């Protein structure tokens, strides 16, 4: 470029741009996946597998669970959480019918997966109706499944997509400077997330400063730093190297913080 008279920085860069094969726009809309509202008193519905840990590990929550609801079709109504979980927990709850929900007793609805319950009852609009009621009552909603038709600062569901990606580093990765423990399994119902919670509980009790990425949509409720909901009804929409790019980026942030 010097031979062609392009000697200034701007001129050389301009020439590079003209002769480039492909142009990359360096921008990113990355922001941590997190909810903006404060939870003080929450109810959970329904009381299915994904909700059990919220009762077992109440000590990891920064808020109070005040009621547990389910559908009459689940056969759980009238039973206690200790009885169903076959263990004694911090607080035992009598499971109530969602039709008798007491709206004045809580500020946040933690809404679990409802597809199986909807199929069982034939009520395909079950989730929609409950969300509309919660919105009308001014309640926060933390949902495990996507509710794309509903937006607002008091509605949250975890999702990882292209908009979640950090700036492109063209294949370069951060060097991980802290020990990392990974929990892996080959199928469902192996207790992978339960083990994540148990390790969190034990390490915090021993005074360790930890950073954590949870693999269930409820992860942020326990104070985990990031959520990567890759389990049942996964809402992760990135694949291949994008997954490596994303997880390497957030692990690097955790290394710097802890």
Model-derived features: where do they sit?
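Flexible phosphate-sensing "switch/lid" loops adjacent to ATP/NTP-binding sites
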Residues: 1-133, 149, 163-182, 189, ...
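A short helix->loop->beta-strand "cap" motif at the edges of active sites that frequently abuts
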Residues: 134-141, 153-154
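Hydrophobic beta-strand scaffold residues
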Residues: 141-142, 210
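Rossmann-fold NAD(P)-binding glycine/threonine-rich loop
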Residues: 147-158
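Hydrophobic positions on the alpha1 helix immediately C-terminal to the Walker A/P-loop
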Residues: 195
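Active-site signature of alpha/beta-hydrolase-fold catalytic machinery across serine-
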Residues: 198
């Amino acid at each position: 470029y010097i031979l062609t008279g392009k000697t200034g920085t701007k001129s050389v860069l301009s020439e590079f741009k003209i002769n480039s094969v492909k142009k990359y726009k360096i921008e990113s809309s990355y922001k941590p996946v997190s909810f903006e509202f404060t939870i003080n008193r929450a109810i959970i519905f329904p009381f299915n597998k994904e909700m059990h840990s919220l009762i077992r590990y109440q000590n990891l929550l920064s808020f109070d669970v005040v009621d547990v609801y389910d559908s009459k079709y689940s056969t759980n109504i009238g039973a206690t959480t200790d009885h169903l979980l076959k263990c004694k927990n911090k607080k035992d709850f009598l499971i109530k019918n969602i039709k008798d929900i007491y709206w004045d007793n809580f500020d946040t609805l933690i809404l679990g997966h409802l597809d199986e319950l909807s199929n069982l009852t034939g009520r395909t609009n079950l989730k929609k109706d409950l969300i509309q009621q919660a919105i009308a009552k001014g309640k926060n909603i933390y949902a495990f499944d996507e509710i794309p038709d509903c937006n607002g600062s008091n509605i949250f569901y975890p999702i990882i997509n292209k908009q979640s990606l950090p700036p492109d580093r063209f294949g370069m990765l951060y060097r991980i400077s802290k020990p990392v423990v990974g929990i892996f399994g080959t199928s469902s119902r192996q207790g992978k997330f339960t083990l994540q919670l148990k390790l969190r509980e034990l390490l915090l009790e021993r005074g360790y400063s930890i950073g954590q990425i949870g693999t269930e949509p409820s992860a942020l409720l326990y104070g985990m730093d990031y959520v990567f909901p890759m389990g049942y009804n996964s809402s992760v929409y990135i694949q291949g190297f994008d997954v490596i790019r994303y997880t390497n980026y957030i692990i690097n942030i955790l290394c710097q913080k802890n």
